């Protein structure tokens, strides 16, 4: 039952995170211009990098909550410690050279590492169906890419809020 709950939670979180991540990444330029001014256009790339990390943040929340609920708090805390050290090192190396893009990249690297390290310990508690997880990633990922391409295409011809509405319908 715990396995089923974990896999279903993964599915629902992935279904929510992918369209948001792809939609914002595709429309980042228009979103920044709508909310701010052209002065903030350099924030588009960092936004796109950070929003890519949203999917990993969603999944790391699931993995972390799962480990904590299964009495693996020490493991989860250790994972956070390792990721914190990696994040600091990435910022030390990337921030001076790449500025805010480097900081966003460090955050993305940390999000990915948090998922990978947490996922490493999940099989110690349950037997994960990797076939199921990969199936979800491929199906939802493909749908998200199709949505992103259509939103990007439509956004060239209509106001971006209309493109968002279209993306929601897809």
Enumerate the predicted regions with their spans.
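A helix-boundary/kink motif common to multi-pass secondary transporters
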Residues: 72, 98-99, 103, 159
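Alpha-helical transmembrane segments
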Residues: 63-71, 119-134
